[in-house]
């Protein structure tokens, strides 16, 4: 039985079969874990293995017990600040010391070691035998049981004397029972450049050598950055390469996919894929106030316990309303909850905010999420393409299991969110996940130089850059601690010389294991940052006289490229032409706002309302300014609107409501419409809104009193013909005539002053017309109430210091003009003609304005049509 062994072997290794069949019979490639597992099987030993997160949690439990018994110690302050993170660091120290055969002796050497020794008493009761213990037991049992190893041949890349002492003892024990230990053969020497450099490195000779510039056995390919390297290497066939070495193969796989070539298999390192955040996002729902971004992110997970149709509708409702705890969302949940009450109760936040978090609720959530993740992973595992998702779902289940153990250490009925967040920041950390699975016919790729088992004819080593040194064993120890442990033989540390030689041998394995050609790929920058030179490159630059002869700067040639005609638009044409315009479906109604967009900016209307192409994501929450406006509208409606069967609200009634109910109305509106303002980063904005809104409502009430106005409605929906509008506030003056107020939360006060002065207030004039049609009475006054300035802008007269009247330049009936313009624009779009912001005089609409009685367009100083200040399409329509 051939055992190819190295502590570094894991995942894919490069090994060539001994014969032409391509089959490795009676051969296994193992690292230390694999070797111990195989020997345990033969020795009849079995131990339960815990995954790393579970070990961390158990160690945290042990540390909690120790800290309770010994509250004064050198690590107590760190543990109180971040217990789980401290426990994780302590466990890493403990494991590294155990690998040096420490048996928890030397309490008197340092206070830090004394804490580790004390915690170990509790930890051993929770987890039993650890990995170092298993290695020690197997080593003893090989000799005690006289395991027959006569047919065992152990092949290693380095001599056993260079291994860690604990591993070396295991190899010695196997050798004593008849196992044959061999060092794997290296590439044969020749007179090429590669052999010369190999001898230079092995002999550690000083002085310089000169290489044959016509010999291609050793080449250095330099690229500006990782993108250039991956693009070139994926584009080239390079079919004669036996093995590729690439520590981070993700970008290369992406390029191979773009080139239509088989992917080689890669991982995402130090990352947290979206699906693995299920537990983190779900636990974030327990935070108060509720983070609406977390809720939307939780509902948008690609795989979720709740069905996708419901989640999509709920997200849309949250975005439209500005929050979750409102009537619209409550009604939607109720509609879909039948038969799923428990599911909704567990995986959705409560509609009533609570100041406490019950441990039982958190435990139930974690348990149900774990069960669902395992079931979903099992169901998805039947299809190979779901491999990455299955891996991530099982990671979620493991995190849930670890978190449930943490909850078991918490004895109180309630738990604060800071504790939950602290635990999750440690458990839900970054890890390695599958990016792509190797496809048939792909290149042979290994992720580390040390994983070359067989001699290769041609090797490409990508990433010969950066610091290659390894951290020394137990490097976290203070010199005094290490000296004390070594002097008293409490640890059997790796000899520094042997450790250095071992890492150097393994790091330079491509040099020893390549016979024909070795290509070293160097990237000068990674992620925009300059990289350190690899020790091998430094050595070559110092000792190779003609180093420039073997350095190449490859680029992709221009041959084979398809010529592409350059598209250049020096200026925007007056009109764009749209094919198949007859297929456009118009909405069944327009609003005063969309009418303005259609008439003045038809390109924007086409993109946003007909083609539904917008810059906002479907689940993008409104910004702070918009949220302030929503809250203000909701508070005004709550306090000013008529109640019950009353036809109107009088100023005196409103004054009492404001005095008694403002705080409650504000809190309710904030929860329902302005959840984004409750986030920590927006607290100053929220406090400012509270003060500004109260001031604005006081001014609004004063205006009602001074002008003898009473409120007849808020958020009044009216539909006249094919125009649908929602009027913010309808009022009635002392003569019984209707009045309209439209509320704006904006700092763009100059814009509203201009549209009133120029008689271009489309929204107000349409509201005037619609209310007149509805009530069969003339609406003599309409106005904008501008917040937070608390000013009333109108063309008509109102009494009060905060009321400003603007005299219009003309008294045109703009509603009739707009009606004609709507018909004109619809006809244009139906014929595929889309007006842009071209030269003003070139626009057909401008030419027809007077003749056809159209609503006039504005002209800017550059001689073109004035653009939309709020446009999302400036890239297309300048």
What are these regions (language model features)?
Residues 218, 459, 465-589, 795-844, ...:
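Accessory/regulatory regions of helicases
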Residues 150-152, 334-448, 632, 637-710, ...:
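Accessory C-terminal helicase-associated subdomains
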Residues 9-149, 160-165, 309-345:
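Basic/charged alpha-beta structural segments of nucleotide/phosphate-handling enzymes
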Residues 1-12, 142, 192-261, 284-290:
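Helicase P-loop NTPase motor core
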Residues 5-9, 18-19, 26-35, 153-159, ...:
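Conserved helicase core region in the C-terminal RecA-like lobe
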Residues 20-29, 34-38, 43-44, 234-349, ...:
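ATPase/helicase motor core of nucleic-acid motors
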Residues 570-878:
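RecB-family 4Fe-4S metal-dependent nuclease core
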Residues 314-332, 385-547, 745-747, 751-754:
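Conserved C-terminal motor-coupling region of P-loop helicases
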